[in-house]
């Protein structure tokens, strides 16, 4: 059975390899200090929130999410990071994490729950197409 719970201090050793795996998947390298800062923010649970998915007591998936204001409605929930260990894929871990975030969003009174992925991430998109609706938006990033 998949167990989902908020990240806690004792989860650091299980969280970090998955966080690094997630960043590697998106071809992003970060300094160790960034992982430390992110971990502190996740554990504080004020600005960003983190979940761990466990199978047989081992952390095999993580989700990071946050709530933010929206111009025309109440707050919304954004799932920023979702990653499942390769050996645990296809076992419902990502779905369980998404559903747990959806429940947190409902409990908080959010009116929308959304996330993004790379256009070519076919494996993830196959899941997302089953459990959510693609809204057709295209994202642009402006350099700062």
Which ranges hold each PLM region?
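Extreme N-terminal starter segment of soluble prokaryotic enzymes
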Residues: 2-3
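Acetyl-CoA-dependent GNAT
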Residues: 6-74, 98, 104, 135, ...
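Acidic/polar helix N-cap motif
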Residues: 8-11, 85, 121
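Conserved active-site alpha-helix within GNAT-family acetyltransferase domains
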Residues: 95, 119-138
């Amino acid at each position: 059975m998949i167990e989902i719970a908020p990240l806690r201090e004792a989860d650091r050793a299980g969280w970090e390899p998955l966080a690094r795996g997630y960043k590697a998947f998106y071809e992003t390298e970060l300094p160790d200090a960034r992982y430390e800062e992110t971990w502190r923010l996740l554990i504080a649970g004020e600005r960003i929130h983190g979940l761990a998915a466990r199978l047989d007591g081992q952390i095999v998936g993580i989700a990071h999410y946050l709530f933010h204001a929206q111009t025309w409605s109440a707050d919304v929930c954004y799932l920023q990071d979702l990653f499942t260990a390769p050996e645990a894929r296809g076992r419902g871990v990502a779905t369980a994490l998404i559903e747990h975030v959806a429940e947190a969003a409902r409990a908080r009174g959010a009116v929308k729950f959304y996330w993004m992925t790379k256009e070519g991430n076919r494996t993830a998109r196959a899941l997302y197409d089953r459990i959510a609706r693609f809204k057709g938006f295209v994202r642009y990033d402006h350099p700062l």
